[in-house]
Amino acid sequence: MKEGKALELFNLSTFVFTIINLLVLYYILKRLLFKPVTKFLEDRENKIKSALEDADKQREEAYSLKAQYEEKLQNAENEGRAIIEKAQKEAEERASEIIKSANKEAESIIEKAKEEAVLEKIKAMHELRAEMSHLIIEAASKVLEKKLPVEDEDLIKEVIEEAGSWNK
């Protein structure tokens, strides 16, 4: 009996029915649950991959933009330095030109003053000679108590000029 009860517990029709139920349940679950869940997981995985790829692209673009901006900044700094250097050079050249011009003008003024001094000296010498000849004539006429003729005055002027040329 014990064997019969064991057989009753193990009934072939129940076993087959249970297997069929399991297969039907598996098919229904596969169709209704496993495929949508698998598709959902695959879609989610694809979205995550896409988001990661987009993030990588954006990071690369950001690095590229950063490099471009740094290059532009460096170029701007270089241009600024070049402009400053050019302005300094131009200022130095202008200052040099102004100094040269001032030196030329000073030399011109000094040269003109020297020429004027020489002319004044010559003028003073002529005036002194004329005055000396006049004084000598007056002194000689007082000594001789008479007025010298014009020819004698010319002779005295010649003597004074010769004496003056010896002192030059």
UniProtKB/Swiss-Prot annotation:
Family per record: Belongs to the ATPase B chain family.
Xref: Gene3D superfamilies: 6.10.250.1580
Gene symbol of the encoding locus: atpF
Membrane topology according to the record: Single-pass membrane protein
Gene Ontology MF terms in the entry: proton-transporting ATP synthase activity, rotational mechanism; proton-transporting ATPase activity, rotational mechanism
Function: F(1)F(0) ATP synthase produces ATP from ADP in the presence of a proton or sodium gradient. F-type ATPases consist of two structural domains, F(1) containing the extramembraneous catalytic core and F(0) containing the membrane proton channel, linked together by a central stalk and a peripheral stalk. During catalysis, ATP synthesis in the catalytic domain of F(1) is coupled via a rotary mechanism of the central stalk subunits to proton translocation.
Pfam families: ATP-synt_B
Cellular localisation: Cell membrane
PANTHER family assigned to the protein according to its UniProt record, in alphabetical order: ATP SYNTHASE SUBUNIT B', CHLOROPLASTIC (PTHR33445:SF2)
Protein name: ATP synthase subunit b
Subunit structure comment from the entry: F-type ATPases have 2 components, F(1) - the catalytic core - and F(0) - the membrane proton channel. F(1) has five subunits: alpha(3), beta(3), gamma(1), delta(1), epsilon(1). F(0) has three main subunits: a(1), b(2) and c(10-14). The alpha and beta chains form an alternating ring which encloses part of the gamma chain. F(1) is attached to F(0) by a central stalk formed by the gamma and epsilon chains, while a peripheral stalk is formed by the delta and b chains.
TM region positions: 9-29
Cellular component per GO, a single term: proton-transporting ATP synthase complex
Keyword annotations of the record: ATP synthesis, Cell membrane, CF(0), Hydrogen ion transport, Ion transport, Membrane, Transmembrane, Transmembrane helix, Transport
NCBIfam families named among the record's database cross-references: ATP_synt_b (TIGR01144)
